[in-house]
Amino acid sequence: MTERALSRLEVPAPAPKPRNAGMTMFTDLGCGLHEQEDRMQIAGDFVDLAKLATSMVSTLPKEIIRKKVELYRKYGVEAFPGGVQMEHALYAHGMDIADYVFEEMKDLGLRVVEVSDNYLDLTLESKCKLIEKGAKEHGLKILAEAGDEVEETPLEALIHDCQSCKEAGAYKVLLEAAELMDKKTGELKMHYLDAIKDAVGLEHIIFELPWVWLENVHWYQSFSSLAVMVKKLGPEVNLGNIEMSMLVYAQMIRNGAGTKLAKDRQV
């Protein structure tokens, strides 16, 4: 067992991998292998999934992608391609290209693939067929994104999206961060968190944190949303889009000993 300082404080150790709850996903925007190794040496125990951003898989050489996948797996972290990669392929070549893409991902050593419909006008039925194809025909774990990055989805429709993805065989449902934010106030829509948790099941969802690429989102929203979600849903909530430099900090929040926690404690 790893020895930590201040052992009398009894800070909880992360659950052993593979985990089904308390999972952390972050986005790799193209860091080099040395930086990747450094990050994982420090934070690998706390991380479960690493998204290879957008179309990285078709942008970098195969040998680099394979090395990144292997290096993450060394620390018990599964890399996966962002959903834009599949969306771009479908847009350029049609639905029949999906089998080729899934097999190419497996050839790169990937075991997890994201299916999304952020930029491609896929029907829910088509998205679910892709999920089923990837999971049942190709033996992959499919992360299915639910929600829209631009348009606000009514709560009932968003829940239906999540449930449909789960029933189609999704490993986890990635809940689009933009759907969780009130576009006027920038605050989290707390009633969405409760309703989706109750209807779909906390263990089936990865709640994405808002990132600065969303309109009117600044670091404050991403930073504070992390603490709010953990306080609201508990330390076992699955979280996505953690900034790479905040992986250790996210674990501190899960442990109940980070900043941005409510001042409602007494000594």
Predicted regions and their residues:
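Conserved N-terminal beta1-alpha1 strand-loop-helix module at the mouth
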Residues: 1-69
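C-terminal alpha-helical cap/extension of soluble enzyme domains
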Residues: 5-8, 200-267
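Active-site-adjacent beta->alpha loops and helix N-cap segments on the catalytic face
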Residues: 10-13, 34, 58-71, 90-99, ...
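Active-site mouth loops of central-metabolism enzymes
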Residues: 20-35, 53-58, 80-97, 143-157, ...
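Hydrophobic faces of well-ordered beta-strands that scaffold small-molecule active sites
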Residues: 21-27, 47-52, 79-82, 113-115, ...
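Acidic (Asp/Glu)-rich catalytic clusters
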Residues: 37-46, 63-76, 99-109, 129-137, ...
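Glycine-rich phosphate-binding active-site loops on the catalytic face of alpha/beta enzymes
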Residues: 53-54, 108, 112-119, 164-182, ...
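Histidine/lysine/aspartate-rich catalytic loop segments that bind and position anionic ligands
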Residues: 135, 141-147, 155-156, 162-171, ...
